[in-house]
Amino acid sequence: MSSDFTKEVDKDNIAIITWNCLDKSMNTMTEDGLRSFQQLLTEALSDEKIKGIIITSGKVDFSGGMDLSTLEALKRNSGSDPASKIFDYIMEAHGLLRKIELGRIDDTSKSKPVAFAGSGICAGIGTEIGLACHRRFLSSSKNS
């Protein structure tokens, strides 16, 4: 599992999920990264002690979007039906965004507020993550 995302819980029981691709100059979403993010978000949403969630970046810029090499690998490894494999991946990302929007895992769980704290460039899936959150806090930089 990717370590592009980490989760910590502060003294007020707020979960902070940080996106920080250590081996890249900018955060880009990979297949492992998406699954790691999904797992950490699910853990935070299902933990009754956690009151809310903040999604942020460990870098100056929030995100450069989807890692294009991930899409290429999905296409290359999907056999005779690459569109289906890529569609499944995009729908997995959509499910994650929907979970953020709802602030809960399913219709039976209690909703939690999810906030976005970003700065700098925020492209593609990064923009979608920010828009899925209930509140957005951006730096005053002209690049945000």
What are these model-predicted stretches?
Residues M1-T56:
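Conserved CoA-thioester-binding segment of acyl-CoA-metabolizing enzymes
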Residues E48-K51, F87, K112:
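Short coil/turn segments at beta-strand junctions that form active-site/ligand-binding loops
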Residues S57-L96, C122:
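Glycine- (often His-adjacent) and acidic-residue-rich active-site loop
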